[in-house]
């Protein structure tokens, strides 16, 4: 008999590093990240760490991947900073998400956990972000509306809708409050 566990089934990345939009599928047992230098292995692993550690501190990012021109930070990943000093999203306002889809192998209940960011073109540090979770799988639109990543307000709306859905594992309990962790590190109840 298999031991029940929680497994990553998929990961969605919108506007992180050199990745504009990517859905990754994971195998239950083994996942191999391979590729040439600069192909994005550390980019994906750092995205996973931002969600799992619940921190935007550069201390959790892969320091070995830094180069002389660029020190990795969450903001540099969000902007899509390149080795030549340019950035994919350097001069625009944009939103970004990193989401992990997790399935309980015993109950087959699926939950998504993630981080959502809003960055203005003039931002020199990270000002608007939130960590979130919701029941059910990654939505079919992959957190995009008209090919534009959801804002934090849209993430909040989705989370509230999912809390009332049949997919919600706590559907027998009325959840009237949702907790969002803001960039101040303090909880705010909505």
Role assignments for model-derived ranges:
Residues 1-156, 181:
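Extreme N-terminal "head/tail" segments of very large remodeling/mechanoenzyme assemblies
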Residues 160-190:
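Extended, Lys/Glu-rich alpha-helical coiled-coil stalks
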């Amino acid at each position: 008999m298999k031991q029940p566990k929680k497994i990553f089934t998929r990961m969605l990345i919108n506007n992180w590093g050199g990745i504009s939009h990517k859905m990754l599928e994971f195998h239950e047992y083994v996942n191999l990240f391979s590729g040439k230098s600069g192909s994005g292995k550390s980019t994906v692993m750092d995205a996973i760490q931002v969600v799992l550690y619940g921190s935007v501190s550069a201390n959790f990012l892969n320091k070995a991947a830094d180069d002389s021109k660029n020190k990795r930070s969450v903001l540099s990943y969000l902007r899509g900073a390149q080795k030549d000093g340019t950035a994919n999203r350097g001069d625009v306002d944009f939103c970004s998400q990193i989401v992990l889809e997790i399935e309980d192998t015993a109950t087959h209940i699926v939950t998504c956990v993630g981080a959502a960011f809003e960055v203005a073109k003039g931002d020199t540090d990270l000002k608007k972000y939130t960590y979130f979770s919701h029941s059910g799988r990654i939505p079919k639109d992959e957190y995009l509306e008209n090919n534009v990543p959801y804002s934090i307000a849209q993430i909040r709306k989705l989370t509230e809708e999912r809390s009332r859905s049949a997919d919600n594992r706590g559907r027998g309990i009325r959840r009237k409050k949702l907790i969002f962790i803001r960039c101040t590190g303090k909880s705010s109840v909505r």
